[in-house]
Regions:
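Core catalytic region of metal-dependent phosphoesterases/phosphodiesterases
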Residues: 2-96
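Acidic, His/Gly-enriched loop-helix segments that form or flank divalent-metal centers
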Residues: 76-125
């Protein structure tokens, strides 16, 4: 079984489309979250992931876009980007993000955005 994995798109539609153009056919596409944030195309990115991903988990930017979670922990630029994203995200896309979980388990692996215990913990070298 072969999967393609995408993460931290942050609303960058051009980068997402370029990544998809490079991906060989696989058994599924897995998205590790942060579909929105920073970039100018949050709705288009959500819609493309919705259409193509086999499984998707929430990232911290996705959560912030739908319920203000943790905005105080974002740097000022990220906070401003998330507030803008909140104003342009369609209700349908917000509802879809809200339907996602923080983890996705299959027998072979566990998908999370950050770390298995605390989903939004940054992984540092």
């Amino acid at each position: 079984v072969r999967y393609a994995i995408v993460s931290d798109v942050h609303g960058n539609l051009e980068a997402l489309q370029a990544a998809f153009a490079l991906v060989e056919p696989t058994d599924g596409l897995l998205c590790l979250g942060d579909i929105v944030g920073y970039g100018p195309n949050p709705n288009e990115c959500v819609e493309l992931i919705r259409a193509r991903a086999t499984a998707t988990v929430l990232g911290n930017h996705d959560v912030a876009a739908i319920d203000n979670f943790g905005l105080a922990y974002f740097n000022p630029t990220a906070r401003e980007a998330m507030r803008w994203t909140q104003t342009v995200l369609t209700p349908q896309n917000a509802d879809w993000l809200n339907s996602l979980g923080y983890e996705f388990r299959v027998p072979e692996f566990l998908l999370v955005h950050g770390a298995p215990v605390t989903y939004f913990e940054y992984i540092l070298d």
